Design a protein with these regions (language model features):
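N-terminal leader/linker segments that precede catalytic domains of diphosphate-processing enzymes
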Residues: 21, 26, 36-303
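Low-acidity, Ser/Thr- and Arg-rich intrinsically disordered low-complexity segments
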Residues: 2-10, 18, 30-33, 40
């Protein structure tokens, strides 16, 4: 279980608390001056989701998919448990997502979307990975049937690119249906520089299924429910996922989360090391809307 620096904050009741940081954590820099300058410049440039990744990082995209809860409670989000054999975050519960491929950039140059090509490629990757990992087609111009979604998933397994799928079904993606949430880039070589997006399914009356290769289980839960599952040891959650679940738990609906995110210009989150009472913590800047901003290295799962 994380060690929360503000003793008033509970992961389950985080909605009741203002976001911010507890006492005792010192910030040497807005992002962290204890990391090499070159790394800070690589991962911290600008405030856009479309800023280019540094040469040592791997561009990636992920999407938090919302649906309304049948019981009228807080909205649920789609999570998947990665196969234990996966090199990154094996066995962990994560949001759908993955690397931004060259084919995503190629498609971005072909579509009319109103974004710069890097931003469009990230959004295309988020849509593609959600089909691959969950069999869920988001953001298209027409209603997609379960049979079409299954065929699209099969095509991606064979081709690996979204363009042939769009051509096969006559789909046109609306990239504006994805809303920026955050961007994370840890400060080590080969880290994923990940753009996080939000998407809304409304009632969520769709079929999703595991792919039996990269993931072994899919489930819907509110952010607060997912945090509780982690605290009970029912799921394993890595540091970035947990921090974003806590931020999502501040909100009962997709609209609330979307509007909240719009208050914070996208600035790359680079966790940094801090020391509190002789103990090392992994820490976030305290001005990005995260209600819990530090966790002891002793309790962190990093991926």
């Amino acid at each position: 279980m994380p060690v929360y620096r503000n003793p008033c904050i509970s992961a389950i009741f985080v909605k009741l608390m203002p976001y911010g940081n507890g006492p005792g954590v010192k910030y040497p820099d807005r992002i962290g001056s204890n990391m090499p300058l070159a790394t800070r410049l690589t991962c911290r440039k600008g405030t856009s989701m479309s800023e280019k990744s540094g040469p040592q990082s791997i561009p990636a995209a992920t999407v938090v998919v919302f649906r309304r809860a049948a019981n009228g409670g807080p909205a649920q989000v789609l999570m998947l448990e990665r196969a234990s054999t996966m090199r990154f975050a094996g066995g962990a519960a994560v949001f759908p997502g993955g690397r931004i491929d060259p084919s995503d950039h190629e498609l971005a140059m072909q579509l009319s979307h109103g974004f710069d090509n890097d931003e469009a490629a990230a959004r295309i990757a988020a849509l593609r990975e959600t089909i691959e990992e969950a069999g869920l087609v988001l953001g298209m111009n027409v209603r997609v049937t379960p049979d079409q979604a299954a065929e699209a998933r099969g095509m991606l397994a064979g081709h690996g690119a979204l363009a042939p799928v769009l051509e096969r079904f006559g789909w046109v993606p609306d990239l504006s249906t994805l809303h920026p949430w955050s961007r994370w880039c840890p400060d080590w070589k080969g880290a994923f520089d990940t753009c996080f997006y939000l998407a809304d399914l409304g009632t969520g009356a769709v079929e999703v299924s595991k792919d039996d290769t990269e993931n072994t289980h899919l489930f819907w839960a509110s952010a607060r429910e997912a945090i509780a599952m982690s605290e009970r040891g029912e799921i394993s959650v890595i540091f970035p996922t947990l921090r974003n679940l806590e931020r999502l738990a501040l909100h009962d609906s997709f609209a609330e989360a979307r509007d909240f995110a719009a208050r914070f210009p996208i600035r790359t989150v680079v966790p940094f090391r801090s020391e509190v009472d002789g103990e090392d913590y992994l820490t976030l800047p305290n001005d990005l809307g995260y209600p819990v901003t530090s966790q002891s290295f002793k309790t962190i799962r990093r991926g």
